Amino acid sequence: MSVPSSLMKQPPIQSTAGAVPVRNEKGEISMEKVKVKRYVSGKRPDYAPMESSDEEDEEFQFIKKAKEQEAEPEEQEEDSSSDPRLRRLQNRISEDVEERLARHRKIVEPEVVGESDSEVEGDPWRMEREDSSEEEEEEIDEEEIERRRGMMRQRAQERKNEELEVMEVEDEGRSGEESESESEYEEYTDSEDEMEPRLKPVFIRKKDRVTVQEREAEALKQKELEQEAKHMAEERRKYTLKIVEEETKKELEENKRSLAALDALNTDDENDEEEYEAWKVRELKRIKRDREDREALEKEKAEIERMRNLTEEERRAELRANGKVITNKAVKGKYKFLQKYYHRGAFFMDEDEEVYKRDFSAPTLEDHFNKTILPKVMQVKNFGRSGRTKYTHLVDQDTTSFDSAWGQESAQNTKFFKQKAAGVRDVFERPSAKKRKTT
């Protein structure tokens, strides 16, 4: 493998860490150190633009690709730099890129901390060729730059003229139809889109225009709705008048019937003296009934006052001698084994009627049978049903719950039973109406 003479002449690089090949203004390549900045998550790099559009993103990617292509082996750089045609083409491409970027933004390149001690030197023959070709390149570049500047000025002037024409047309449209103007969002692309051919306007007759037809259809529809509303209002008015007329007829007919009924009454055969005598009898009965009720109430109050003035022994003797008369007193019957109990109730027992004097303790339905001969397991209520009982009766069953709080022998329970519990204290005094204060 042959090594180029230019590389042989270069002094050896002691360390290439952090060094990248950089091309200077003369087209020479040298290794320069760059300042490596620390990467911070979520922070924008220094070389990245603050704001960018789609066109700038594409240009930024193009610059990255161009830089990647520059970082090639030094052998290919030496071969390309020796050819003046390739060098002129590269310089022209780089100038185009720089000119395009200058119109948009400025690319921040990596900061150069320092340069290497030795730079790459070309051979004498290549240096002479470069000096001779630089003058030709400068002349070509000046002409090219002047031509491009003229084209850019012409393009800018054309764009400005078009914008003025569009603004004049929009101003005329706004003055003619201010009520129908609406805000629209328009998207403009590059100059190529603006230079597209415009369509020729076509005249449309007024009767064939869609907006006029829609306006006429809307007016016709509104007119139909108004006519329908008037028709509905007229129908409601007629219906209301009909209801009022019917109500008036009903009132007239009712008045006629009442007058006919009054005329049908025959008062010729009435006797005023008989009516007066009947009225006197009714009034006498009412007076007698009121007097009896008043005397019974006074008698009851006097009896209550007399019983209150009696002593305890006299009251007991009085009750034994004159027992309380109970209306519809029930006969205490004997219930059979597992017989169902029916409660007579306490309402309306003050009325003396035969139905309230029946024996409610008499057996009914299946209670007529003797259930003592049944097996022990069947001697329960509702046997074989969902409402059956657990025990036959609670006479031989101890249902005391010894785990309950009130069944425990504690100081708190003992104090409660001695002081507050009813039926467990040795007190046989008659309770008074007023509550005694306990200390």
Swiss-Prot record:
Entry keyword set: Acetylation, Isopeptide bond, mRNA processing, mRNA splicing, Nucleus, Phosphoprotein, Spliceosome, Ubl conjugation
Main localization category: nucleus
GO terms (BP aspect): mRNA splicing, via spliceosome
GO cellular component: centrosome; microfibril; nucleoplasm; nucleus; U2-type precatalytic spliceosome; U2-type spliceosomal complex
Pfam families on file: MFAP1 (PF06991)
Positions of modified residues (N-acetylserine): 2
Acidic residues composition bias: residue spans: 71-81, 112-122, 131-144, 178-195
Biased composition (Basic and acidic residues): 23-34, 61-70, 145-163
Segments of this protein annotated with the region Disordered: 1-200
Modified residues annotated as Phosphoserine in this record: 52-53, 94, 116, 118, 132-133, 361, 432
Family listed: Belongs to the MFAP1 family.
Name of the protein this chain belongs to: Microfibrillar-associated protein 1
Organism: Bos taurus
Underlying gene: MFAP1
